[in-house]
């Protein structure tokens, strides 16, 4: 679910020009709702939360010049390995600003399964925003080595997730993946653990 930090009045004007329908917010924090194509947005003071089957129906309107390169940080967490698991991801623009972030539980999984699910969530979010190039950064050496083909992927479930990640990567003009220390991946790690704490 993309979160777009933007000027809400400008975003509403762009959506109105594109033919979106609007309704009032459901709480004191929600300013308004908008529907366009197969996407639904909820407006807050300085951001839009976009949902639906095709978030780009809205994100492409409010951020028409997105393109470019994004840095995607991802992390998976599992308590019990296997056990309750969650993912966290953060998209950072070239100028260092956070474009979007998310964290969600994924049920019962191993740590490696959660890492792959976090990677896939980050790739899907970056695709929804329409970025051309992606630089992936995660603290799982296994995911990095398997994704690049340096290591075999013997586990059938991880192999399926690797195939899905590679399919998503074909939607980008260029991509790379870098193994980073946990401290560098702190925000994605925190989002995954917050999702587990809130479950």
Curated annotation (Swiss-Prot):
UniProt key word Protein biosynthesis: no
Top-rank taxon: Archaea
Span of the signal peptide: none
Principal EC category: hydrolase
Annotated Mn(2+) 1 binding sites: 75, 115, 139
Region (As active as intact RNase H): 69-199
Catalytic reaction annotation: Endonucleolytic cleavage to 5'-phosphomonoester
GO CC field: cytoplasm
CDD domains: RNase_HI_like
Chief location category: cytoplasm
EC number, UniProt record: 3.1.26.4
Co-factor remark: Divalent cations; Mn(2+) and Mg(2+) are preferred over Co(2+) or Ni(2+). Divalent cations are required for folding and substrate-binding, while divalent cations and NaCl are required for maximal protein stability.
InterPro entries, alphabetized: RNaseH-like_sf (IPR012337), RNaseH_domain (IPR002156), RNaseH_sf (IPR036397), RnhA-like_halobact (IPR049863)
Chain positions recorded as Mg(2+) 1 binding sites: 75, 115, 139
GO molecular function, one term: exonuclease activity
Effect of residue 179 to A/W: No loss of RNase H activity
Region spans: Not required for RNase H activity: 1-68
Residues that coordinate or bind Mn(2+) 2: 75, 189
Subcellular localization: Cytoplasm
Family the entry assigns: Belongs to the RNase H family.
PANTHER family: POLYNUCLEOTIDYL TRANSFERASE, RIBONUCLEASE H-LIKE SUPERFAMILY PROTEIN, RIBONUCLEASE HI
Name the UniProt record assigns to this protein: Ribonuclease HI
Organism, as annotated: Halobacterium salinarum (strain ATCC 700922 / JCM 11081 / NRC-1) (Halobacterium halobium)
